[in-house]
Amino acid sequence: VNDSLWLGLAITSPYGMRIRYGSDWAAHERGISGSVTTVDINPSIAWKVNDYVSLGGGVSALWTHSKIKSGIPEGVGDGQFEYKGSDWMFTYNLGLMVTPIEDLRFGVSYRSSAHVTTRGDYYIRGNNYMNGEGDGKGRLQTPETVYISATWKPIQRLRLSGLARWANWKKFENMRFSMDDSNNLQKTQFGQMVSIGSPGLAGMLQTGLSNISIQNDWKAAWLFSLGADLDITDQWTIRGGIALETDPIKHQQLRTALIPDTKRLWLTCGLSWKPTPKWQIDMAYGHIRGIGHRDLYQSDTSNVKVGKFEKMNAWMAGAAVTYRF
């Protein structure tokens, strides 16, 4: 807008995952398949108070689409549960940057938690007592995050940076799914016999099958990173970084097959091209390697191991286009 006020717009995907196993694998009660896709539209404003202090903030419209399939928890028979749903929700972010001297700056930023409630389709299949489908809801809460960063320019074309990120994964206590009308569940022949012989048990089974929760009970996690940017020319910049992220899983029995997290090592690289003073194109590649515990237990209260994830690796690639008005 002017030399001290900026408007911006970012479109990103802050969270996401996809995982799939065979429907008949031995630990299907711990998860069969899952995917979460997000798109975050974040208009923002920044104000340069003076040569030393800048403030910023924004509001995000976050679209989430999720698909979850899992074996039905113990106690309500066998079979599979599946949910597909999507919806919009809103969060906000705030930031502060301090530049005590020309070649050194510090930043602090905060992003709020999001209460995600999606609407979609709820399915129960292959159960001994009841099966059916209908409208349903999915609920979870994303973590609030705090970033603390520092950037130093020791020489003209080199910038060194460090970052610490705190993510309050305590908010990610569970994922809850419910069917709007449990009468959409139709009793099997065996279920009808149970209903005649024990109406109370049949009611408990209907409630259990129409309200399924996947327990996470995670803890807050930290990420620490170091990086460097080198300007090869006025148009080209290369960069690289390394980061270590702590394990958010409170105890190992809580690890599910759907989100098998652990301590992680990040390795990243990228480059920027400025064809004109107003346009910039950024490209990045990252590799995440799980380096912590990888055991999977029979349930979140069991000491029986049913397996171990041989590898927990991920690869990421991204690109961005920036235009400065």
Segments and roles (model prediction):
Residues 1-325:
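Outer-membrane beta-barrel porins/channels
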